[in-house]
């Protein structure tokens, strides 16, 4: 092998020496009898058996977000891992809280989702492929519910469920556009009641959201019972508790709800648990994992999906309303290539030097930084370094941040790792930010109506002139008001590539309106989803899926997971 060969993420992961998970638990302060082992390097934590340190103040949360991304992503997970490793290297007691990867994007576009280079969580292939079975359990609970609903309709429909007004779909942890719209119950009177149906991807399921927002097993059961899956013929909402199956669904999730403990390459403890997308769901790991990490560590580094307009806004306005997990510091990840794309450079030319394009695209970063400040937090910009970045481009961006009064650091945590010195400057700036006074607040009060909440988000965060509602969305607004759901927060479903609902409009557009085509009350999770533009809750695969490059070697080890 050439000394100059750049190793892939998978090769780096396979070359790493992992510690037994019991050693990672000891490092985190987790008593061994709270562990439920899944082999030598993975464990679930039974939080009921966790012996917590007396008198310890809750750890401070660092939320990692980003500017609007390129299709390959800008390295939030890599930065999260590298930053945590660097903080640990500086002597802080740190834990990571991350989402679990979804199989659809792994086989589709991303190829893996556990960080990259020398800033990864391990065992990388296990986490990317099935892990501890949490997504299987969530998928099973979701589809069990729909099987029970359709069976109830077939067996006489005592609740009077209207098959034309179902609001809940079956799910699959895969990108499969062919399943977006289907018809079920065909084949005669013994095969069920025919109706139009469809599939969502598992990470868009309300059960995934409930799973990630529940505070404990009892809260999980209560939230599952509150899920509205459809309406009766007289348009009365029907819930899981009406059907009487919340106990069965809780049973299917009783082990999955326990957080998963793994490690970084540098040996930092990491809780990887839950995984809703941020463009079509709320985009944060489980609340149980975040809260557990805060009880054990002094600093918890977590991330929220896609740009600060999506995951970070939802962390602040949805997750941080349920428990005391508000961030004390926020990191906005920026890359030279993303700035170039936002400045109008085509994908195939992103690796070419172009300071002018960086300058043209920086308005996108500026809006994201300003948006974080609207929650009362001054962010730190982490410039995730790529090999194609030139000194001139990096110097220009650092100078721009300085002129804007924004703390910034170049982080080479992919190439040098956070366990090395690749994230030391970033860690120092984040540690300083954690000591600064925080004035965190939500973007809007819950007393505001749903229409006004949406208008606030699109105007304050996206920079839109206003919002337009389709006729079906306006009808659903009236239903939301009638059923007493107006006090719920809003979860916007929007393309991740633009502040608008049009993925092709890059930069920091002005003079546009956001189009809300549908509103979906998620009464178990406790928010209203607003579908905008053409965003899909069941994605499709690209023309050349990453799966085409994947295989196993003669020893059964995966290859091609980037």
Swiss-Prot record:
According to the lineage, what is the superkingdom?
Bacteria
Keywords of this protein's UniProt record, alphabetized?
ATP-binding, Ligase, Nucleotide-binding, One-carbon metabolism
Q: Which GO terms describe its biological process?
A: tetrahydrofolate interconversion
Q: Which Gene3D superfamilies match?
A: Domain 2, N(10)-formyltetrahydrofolate synthetase (3.30.1510.10), Formyltetrahydrofolate synthetase, domain 3 (3.10.410.10), P-loop containing nucleotide triphosphate hydrolases (3.40.50.300)
One Gene Ontology molecular-function label: formate-tetrahydrofolate ligase activity
Q: Which residues bind ATP?
A: 70-77
Q: Which reaction does it catalyse?
A: (6S)-5,6,7,8-tetrahydrofolate + formate + ATP = (6R)-10-formyltetrahydrofolate + ADP + phosphate
Q: Which InterPro entries match?
A: Formate_THF_ligase, Formate_THF_ligase_CS, P-loop_NTPase
Q: In which pathway does it act?
A: One-carbon metabolism; tetrahydrofolate interconversion
Q: What is its EC number?
A: 6.3.4.3
Question: Is Ribosomal protein one of the keywords UniProt gives this record?
Answer: no
The question of whether DNA repair is a record keyword is answered with no
Q: Which Pfam families does the entry link to?
A: FTHFS (PF01268)
Family indicated by similarity: Belongs to the formate--tetrahydrofolate ligase family.
Q: What is this protein called?
A: Formate--tetrahydrofolate ligase
Q: What is this protein's gene name? A: fhs
């Amino acid at each position: 092998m050439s000394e100059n060969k750049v190793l892939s993420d998978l090769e780096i992961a396979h070359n790493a020496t992992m510690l037994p998970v019991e050693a990672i638990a000891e490092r985190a302060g987790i008593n061994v009898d709270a562990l439920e082992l899944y082999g030598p390097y993975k464990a679930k934590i039974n939080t009921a058996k966790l012996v917590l340190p007396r008198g310890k103040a809750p750890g401070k949360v660092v939320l990692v977000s980003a500017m609007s991304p390129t299709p390959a992503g800008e390295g939030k997970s890599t930065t999260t891992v590298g930053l945590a490793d660097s903080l640990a290297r500086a002597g802080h007691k740190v834990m990571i809280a991350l989402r679990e990867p979804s199989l659809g994007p792994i086989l589709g576009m991303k190829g893996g989702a556990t960080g990259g280079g020398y800033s990864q969580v391990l065992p990388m292939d296990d986490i990317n492929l099935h892990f501890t079975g949490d997504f299987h359990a969530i998928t099973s609970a979701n589809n069990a519910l729909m099987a029970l609903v359709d069976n109830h309709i077939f067996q006489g429909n005592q609740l009077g469920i209207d098959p034309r007004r179902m609001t809940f779909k079956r799910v699959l942890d895969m990108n499969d556009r062919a399943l977006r719209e289907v018809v079920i119950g065909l084949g005669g009177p013994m095969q069920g009641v025919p109706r139009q149906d469809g599939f969502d991807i598992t990470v868009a399921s309300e059960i995934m959201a409930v799973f990630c927002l529940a505070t404990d097993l009892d809260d999980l059961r209560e939230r599952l019972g509150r899920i509205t899956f459809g309406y009766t013929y007289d348009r009365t909402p029907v819930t899981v508790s009406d059907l009487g199956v919340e106990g069965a669904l809780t049973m299917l999730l009783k082990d999955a709800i326990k957080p998963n403990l793994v490690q970084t390459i540098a040996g930092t403890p990491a809780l990887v648990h839950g995984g809703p997308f941020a463009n079509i769901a709320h985009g944060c790991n489980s609340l149980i994992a975040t809260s557990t990490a805060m009880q054990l560590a002094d600093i918890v580094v977590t991330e929220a999906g896609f740009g600060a307009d999506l995951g970070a806004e939802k962390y602040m306005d949805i997750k941080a309303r349920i428990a005391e997990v508000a961030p004390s510091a926020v990191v906005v990840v920026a890359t030279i290539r993303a700035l170039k794309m936002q400045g109008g450079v085509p994908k195939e030319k992103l690796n070419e030097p172009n300071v002018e394009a960086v300058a043209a695209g920086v308005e996108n970063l500026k809006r994201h930084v300003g948006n974080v400040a609207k929650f009362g937090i001054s962010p730190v910009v982490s410039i995730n370094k790529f090999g194609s970045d030139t000194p001139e481009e990096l110097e220009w961006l650092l100078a721009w941040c300085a002129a804007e009064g924004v703390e910034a650091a170049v982080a080479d945590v992919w190439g040098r790792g956070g366990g090395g010195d690749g994230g030391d400057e970033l860690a120092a700036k984040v540690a300083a930010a954690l000591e600064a006074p925080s004035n965190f607040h939500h973007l809007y009060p819950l007393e505001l109506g749903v229409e006004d909440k949406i208008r606030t988000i699109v105007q304050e965060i996206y920079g839109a002139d206003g919002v337009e509602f389709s006729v079906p969305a306006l009808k659903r607004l009236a239903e939301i008001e009638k059923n007493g759901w107006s006090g719920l927060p809003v979860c916007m479903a929007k393309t991740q590539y633009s502040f608008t609902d049009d993925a092709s409009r890059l930069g920091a557009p002005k003079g546009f309106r956001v189009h809300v085509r549908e509103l979906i009350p998620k009464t178990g999770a406790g928010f209203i989803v607003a579908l905008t533009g053409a965003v899909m809750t069941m994605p499709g695969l690209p023309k050349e899926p990453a799966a085409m490059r994947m295989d196993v070697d003669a020893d059964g080890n995966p290859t091609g997971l980037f």
